[in-house]
């Protein structure tokens, strides 16, 4: 398989499912008969039974009836394709047919049952079993999973399911999906986990014909990179890509009862499948100069698989019931056309974007860093030897050189153990030195503290170096674990037995294929040899044989006429659909032209027409951006400036109006002048505390200003010395009553006269102090 043929045809197989319970209850007849040995499928038209219409017969590479087993289908049809992918070819397996005919069962099957597992899980086992049995080869296996839902590409392995991906194309790699996530897998369990995660995100719905109908086209991509040492001593990398495609089934709204969202999904599904049929027809028709790959994202992704660099197997799934005879015939006709598609597969050797090469270079770089670290530590280890007394001394150069070979041999036997022993020895050494410093009482406290800090720093550095080395070692092991190498952890005897069994199965499948081809060839040559060998003993025998041959030829003639009539009917139907589409597009185009001619100026129309360009990458018409380049055909004119600071030309009247009134009509800028909308007051005036009226009156009286009181006490002391009673009475006379001041508020003064006993010469008397509260 190292070299491919110049071209090879797409391999087409047909699988017919058994009658389901609904079809049995509805008493539908079985109209499909399958001849497994001859590779033929015959379909009887139930409406043509009365007119004795002959069944339509189709011949394929291989056919499988309702009694076929999953493993039988895989060994005979798909195993050679997966083997070619392991040798560096691109391969594609896709299931095609009406909804509810068993496409998903063929591709996925029942995972927990080994006998009913589909193509995808069987291919997983096949790939990793082949890798485990390989010798002197390194493999890297990556998996991606995407779906095309309503003509939008979604990554089923991404956390953000709302994100839509874009299709890109490069001359060296062809069509690819930008930013599609890819996961490196090391075993069947890991790749099955990737598949299960994607299946949980896939769009599935229920219809009248299928309770678990796929509402999107799903493509599971396995990329296998293999590195092998060539005769020139260099590593050569082969990259094979396996596309496992589970197409959504074509459906009719009258049968599925699709409504609302299901109807929209069915419309998009039928459009993409119709585009796939057009691509198949264009590839088969030698007169077609254009292949409409860009009509659908599905056909763009399958561009290499249909007429490109790939080996392709198409599984056409059909139903046996008379209820679906039209869909069955359509599927068989498309499959019959696909047999004539020619692909040109080639081995993908030493691609530029091989991830395996990057892994190998990164592993080599990390190992080099690790060897430098371990080499530096080994040199330190050889340079310093600790004596019995705890003193360090250096060895001679000759002794160091003598030890190199021994240590290298030991490291070759068990490098990891030596590195671990080295770290343990260094740690014990530092701990021993730290304890010696702690027990040495002759050192000064400051010197002891300095030495302890230095040992702690060395211990920290040692831990950091150890962690860095462990991190590098773990990284190398993790990257090496992703590179799969065969011949490990396998019992050789069991391995050889499995190889022999697989070779026997492949030989049996190849023998069946050759037998089927020989029978088909014998069937074709029977007619030619029959005429040469025929000898007649009588005229009656000759008449009987010729009559039998005539009937056979007449039945073939009727079959060919029926095929021609069906082809004409299909052509007429397709032509009517094209005419209807053309009429709708013409009507819409006339409406657009009418709007443009009546509402858009001719200059603006010409500008738009000259700027419009078709983007083949996105399959859309786009407008080229306007630039300020002087020599450009689409030069953008600058705005006329009437004055500095204004973006628009203004008249004198407009300028005066701007100054006189705040009107937005004459504003030069798109700015409105609005008054400030002040908020409501957030503070209050100060209000003093409320005081009772009596208290307020008392305070007012106490704080009122009073006139000065003059008292003549000249005779008070003279009389005070002669009569004590008089002095007492005089004292009582001059004393204010305790009742307080009168309510009138008038000031009361003590009357004085010359005859008063208080008047007279002596020391002056002063009034007593008065307060609010009597003493």
Swiss-Prot record:
A single GO cellular-component term on record: dendritic spine
Domain of life, source organism: Eukaryota
Keywords, comma-separated and alphabetical: ATP-binding, Cell projection, Cilium biogenesis/degradation, Coiled coil, Cytoplasm, Cytoskeleton, Microtubule, Motor protein, Nucleotide-binding, Synapse
Compartments (UniProt record): Cytoplasm, Cytoskeleton; Cell projection, Cilium; Cell projection, Dendritic spine
InterPro entries: Kinesin-like_fam (IPR027640), Kinesin_motor_CS (IPR019821), Kinesin_motor_dom (IPR001752), Kinesin_motor_dom_sf (IPR036961), P-loop_NTPase (IPR027417)
Positions with biased composition (Low complexity): 718-734, 756-765
GO molecular function: ATP binding; ATP hydrolysis activity; microtubule binding; microtubule motor activity
Region described as Disordered: spans on this chain: 372-419, 716-775
Signal peptide, first to last residue: none
Result of knocking out the encoding gene: Loss of function of Kif3b only results in ciliogenesis defects in a subset of cilia. Robust cilia are still present in the central nervous system. Mutant have rapid rod degeneration and delayed outer segment genesis, but cones appear normal. The mild phenotype of kif3b mutants may be related to the presence of the kif3c protein.
Principal location listed in the UniProt entry: cytoplasm
Biased composition range(s): Acidic residues: 389-413
Similarity section: Belongs to the TRAFAC class myosin-kinesin ATPase superfamily. Kinesin family.
Functional summary from the UniProt entry: Microtubule-based molecular motor that transport intracellular cargos, such as vesicles, organelles and protein complexes. Uses ATP hydrolysis to generate force to bind and move along the microtubule. Plays a role in cilia formation. Required for photoreceptor development.
Protein name per Swiss-Prot or TrEMBL: Kinesin-like protein KIF3B
Species the sequence originates in: Danio rerio
Lineage of origin: Eukaryota, Metazoa, Chordata, Craniata, Vertebrata
Gene coding for it: kif3b
């Amino acid at each position: 398989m190292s070299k491919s043929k110049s071209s090879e045809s797409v391999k087409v197989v047909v699988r017919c499912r058994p009658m389901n319970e609904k079809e049995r209850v509805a008493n539908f007849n079985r109209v499909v008969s399958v001849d497994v040995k001859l590779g033929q499928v015959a379909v009887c038209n139930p409406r043509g039974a009365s007119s004795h219409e002959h069944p339509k017969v189709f011949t394929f590479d291989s056919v499988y009836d309702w009694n076929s087993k999953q493993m039988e289908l895989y060994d005979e049809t798909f195993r050679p394709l997966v083997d070619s992918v392991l040798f560096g070819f691109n391969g594609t397996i896709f299931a095609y047919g009406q909804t509810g005919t068993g496409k998903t069962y063929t591709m996925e099957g029942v995972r927990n049952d080994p006998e009913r597992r589909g193509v995808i899980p069987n291919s997983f086992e096949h790939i990793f079993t082949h890798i485990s049995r390989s010798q002197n080869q390194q493999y890297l296996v990556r998996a991606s999973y995407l779906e095309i839902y309503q003509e939008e590409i979604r990554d089923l392995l991404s956390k953000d399911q709302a994100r839509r991906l874009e299709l890109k194309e490069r001359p060296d790699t062809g069509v690819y999906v930008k930013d599609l996530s890819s996961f490196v897998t090391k075993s069947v369990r890991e790749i099955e986990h990737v598949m299960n995660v994607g299946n949980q995100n896939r769009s599935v719905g229920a219809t009248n014909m299928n309770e678990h109908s796929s509402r999107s086209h799903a493509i599971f991509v396995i990329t296998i990179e293999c590195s092998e040492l060539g005769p020139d001593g260099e590593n050569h990398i082969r990259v094979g890509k396996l596309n496992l495609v589970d197409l959504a089934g074509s459906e009719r709204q009258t049968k599925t009862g699709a409504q609302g969202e299901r109807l929209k999904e069915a419309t998009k599904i039928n459009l993409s499948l119709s585009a796939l049929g057009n691509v198949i027809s264009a590839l088969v028709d030698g007169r077609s100069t254009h292949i409409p790959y860009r009509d659908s994202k599905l056909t763009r992704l399958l561009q290499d698989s249909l007429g490109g660099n790939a080996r392709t197997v198409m599984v056409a799934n059909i139903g046996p019931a008379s209820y679906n005879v039209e869909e069955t015939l359509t599927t068989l006709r498309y499959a019959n056309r696909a047999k004539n598609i020619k692909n040109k597969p080639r081995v993908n050797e030493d691609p530029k974007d091989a991830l395996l090469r990057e892994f190998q270079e990164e592993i080599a770089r990390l190992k080099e860093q690790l060897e430098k670290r371990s080499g530096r530590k080994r040199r330190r280890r050889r340079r310093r030897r600790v004596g019995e007394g705890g003193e360090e001394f250096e060895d001679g150069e000759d002794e160091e050189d003598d030890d190199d070979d021994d240590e290298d041999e030991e490291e070759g036997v068990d490098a990891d153990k030596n590195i671990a022993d080295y770290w343990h020895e260094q740690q014990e050494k530092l701990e021993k030195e730290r304890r010696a410093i702690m027990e040495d009482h002759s050192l000064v406290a400051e010197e002891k503290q300095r030495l302890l800090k230095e040992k702690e720093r060395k211990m920290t550095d040692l831990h950091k170096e150890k962690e860095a080395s462990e991190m590098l070692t773990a990284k190398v092991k993790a990257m090496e674990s992703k590179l799969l190498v065969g011949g490990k952890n396998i019992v050789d005897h069991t391995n050889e037995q499995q190889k022999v069994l697989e070779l026997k199965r492949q030989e049996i499948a190849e023998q069946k294929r050759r037998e089927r081809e020989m029978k088909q060839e014998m069937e074709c040559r029977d007619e030619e040899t029959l005429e040469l060998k025929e000898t007649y003993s009588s005229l009656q025998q000759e008449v009987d044989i010729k009559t039998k041959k005539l009937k056979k030829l007449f039945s073939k003639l009727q079959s060919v006429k029926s095929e021609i009539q069906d082809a004409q009917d299909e052509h007429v139907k397709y032509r009517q659909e094209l005419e209807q589409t053309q009429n709708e597009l013409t009507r819409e185009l006339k409406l657009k032209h009418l709007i443009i001619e009546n509402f858009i100026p001719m200059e603006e129309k010409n500008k738009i027409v000259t700027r419009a360009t078709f983007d083949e990458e996105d399959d859309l018409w786009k407008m080229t951006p306007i630039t300020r380049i002087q020599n450009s055909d689409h030069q953008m004119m600058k705005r006329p400036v009437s004055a500095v600071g204004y973006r628009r030309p203004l008249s004198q009247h407009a300028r005066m109006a701007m100054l006189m009134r705040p009107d937005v009509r004459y504003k030069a800028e798109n700015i409105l002048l609005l008054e400030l909308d002040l908020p409501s007051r957030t503070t209050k005036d100060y209000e003093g505390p409320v005081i009772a009226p009596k208290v307020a009156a008392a305070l007012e009286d106490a704080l009122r200003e009073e006139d000065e009181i003059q008292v003549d006490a000249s005779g008070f002391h003279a009389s005070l010395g002669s009569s004590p009673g008089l002095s007492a009475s005089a004292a009582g006379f001059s004393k204010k009553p305790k009742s307080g001041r009168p309510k009138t508020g008038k000031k009361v003064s003590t009357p004085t006269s010359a005859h008063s006993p208080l008047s007279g010469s002596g020391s002056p008397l002063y009034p007593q102090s008065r307060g609010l509260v009597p003493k």
